[in-house]
């Protein structure tokens, strides 16, 4: 789909408060486009946009798009949205975020990070290495980087590092120069319908990578291995713990606040090379894989091992990725975005590896009824490394469905499959009461979820 854009257009973002939409809006504003938007409620992303003089209306209303000439819609926007319907009625051009993103980055050399999990951290790690190498890239990420306090920034070079969004299939329209596939998991089934359809989309994405670029695919994921059989251009390299990986992880050491590892590089045209004593200030094997993806792409464009290692060592992290918020009774409280069984398992595995003698208390807010119902078996086993799970009410994320799902039954299944203590709470006051009565001694607390749980954790000290 070809998009014709003039700087005189008034481009309206429906659902501008999402992390991906807000990042794209900010970049387009800095490129000189006339941007405005709307969302159902205020948040930190919207406040950041307002500081950049982007007009935003809270609430969706057809009057909001009265003077608009182009509409960009979030994947979270339903077809009965009043602004969407008004735009259709007035025959305004309507584009998905991924379509507009593809247009913006099509004239840049880029690194596109795709996958079910780990995209945000991987995008951030690649960006940090590029910055260390004095390649000032444009960055469009799915999380706020602590190094510059935003999810997006306009760079001075002709490079763009961006995180894709697979939720509506539009990521296949982004033309990558270099592409990364972290993993493929059962997500966004409401759109794809089956894991096979999802895998086929990733095949298209990888096949879009040109001969002068390269794809980097993690070999530690079964679904990733499956798509290798279908990729037609064969222009890819692999990474991971798997011994067949072109960039193989080994000699892993994890401490409380950092990880050290080595990489063995085996390329078809060269003799074996090694990058040793790579240090990252984050924990978990999943993050070591993310860092290895960043090493692979950076090495392939010619960045030196020293600059790669410096970029990783000085990484300042991403908000809501195992972020320490406060301590109570000397017990640390962390906030994490994990909301899928695979993500939860990986975070807890990493925490257990370095906090071996601590009891793990997980405060979990499920995100979407449909996800919990469709993956209830996987969820019921995901918390095996935790000692206590505090279950918060489901964050519905706009879903007005019941699906005949009983939350209390899920709690029972969690107890049965993971053999852990499960406590149901109804609100923040319940959480404060639980904390006062139970959080002390040799414990570590992690809030998990993609909804409002981050606010619950951050506001908890005021209730204690």
Language-model region placement:
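Nucleotide phosphate-binding/pyrophosphate-handling subdomain across enzymes
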Residues: 2-12, 20, 24-31, 255-257, ...
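Conserved N-terminal Rossmann-fold NAD(P)-binding element of oxidoreductases
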Residues: 11-16, 448
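NAD(P)-binding Rossmann-fold cofactor-contacting core
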Residues: 33-48
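Conserved beta-strand positions in the Rossmann-like core of class I SAM-dependent methyltransferases
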Residues: 34-37, 138, 390, 423
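C-terminal helical cap/extension that packs against the catalytic core
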Residues: 380-441
């Amino acid at each position: 789909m070809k998009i014709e854009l003039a700087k005189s257009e008034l481009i309206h973002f429906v659902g501008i408060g999402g992390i991906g939409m807000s990042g794209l809006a900010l970049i387009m504003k800095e490129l000189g486009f006339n941007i405005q938007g709307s969302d159902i409620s205020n948040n930190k992303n919207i406040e950041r946009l307002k500081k950049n003089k982007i007009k935003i209306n809270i609430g969706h209303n057809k009057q909001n798009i009265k003077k608009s000439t182009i509409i960009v819609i979030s994947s979270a926007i339903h077809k009965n949205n009043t602004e969407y319907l008004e735009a259709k009625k007035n025959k305004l051009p309507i584009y998905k975020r991924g379509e507009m993103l593809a247009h913006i980055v099509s004239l840049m050399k880029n690194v596109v990070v795709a996958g079910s999990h780990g995209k945000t951290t991987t995008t951030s790690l690649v960006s940090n290495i590029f910055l260390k190498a004095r390649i000032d890239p444009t960055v469009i990420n799915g999380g706020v980087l602590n190094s510059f306090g935003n999810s997006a920034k306009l760079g001075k070079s002709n490079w763009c590092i961006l995180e894709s969004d697979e939720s509506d299939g539009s990521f296949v329209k982004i033309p990558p120069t270099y592409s990364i596939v972290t993993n493929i998991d059962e997500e966004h089934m409401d759109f794809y319908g089956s894991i096979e359809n999802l895998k086929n989309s990733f095949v298209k994405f990888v096949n879009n990578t040109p001969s002068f670029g390269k794809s980097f695919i993690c070999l530690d994921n079964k679904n990733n291995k499956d798509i290798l059989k279908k990729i037609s251009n064969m222009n890819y390299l692999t990474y991971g713990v798997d011994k067949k990986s072109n960039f193989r992880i080994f000699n892993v050491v994890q401490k409380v606040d950092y990880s050290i590892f080595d990489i063995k590089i085996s390329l078809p045209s060269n003799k074996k090379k090694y990058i040793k004593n790579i240090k990252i200030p984050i924990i978990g094997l999943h993050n070591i894989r993310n860092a290895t993806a960043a090493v692979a792409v950076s090495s392939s464009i010619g960045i030196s091992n020293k600059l790669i290692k410096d970029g990783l060592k000085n990484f300042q992290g991403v908000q809501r990725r195992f972020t320490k918020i406060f301590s109570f009774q000397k017990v640390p409280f962390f906030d994490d975005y994990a909301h899928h069984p695979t993500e939860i398992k990986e975070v807890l595995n990493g925490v257990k590896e370095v906090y071996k003698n601590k009891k793990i208390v997980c405060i979990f807010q499920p995100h979407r009824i449909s996800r919990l119902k469709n993956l209830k078996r996987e969820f019921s086993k995901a918390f095996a490394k935790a000692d206590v799970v505090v279950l918060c009410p489901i964050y519905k994320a706009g879903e007005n469905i019941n699906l005949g799902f009983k939350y209390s039954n899920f709690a029972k299944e969690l107890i049965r499959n993971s053999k852990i203590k499960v406590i149901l709470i109804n609100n923040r006051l319940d959480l404060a009461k639980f904390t006062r009565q139970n959080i002390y001694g040799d414990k570590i607390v992690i809030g998990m979820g993609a909804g409002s749980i981050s606010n619950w954790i951050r506001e908890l000290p005021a209730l204690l």
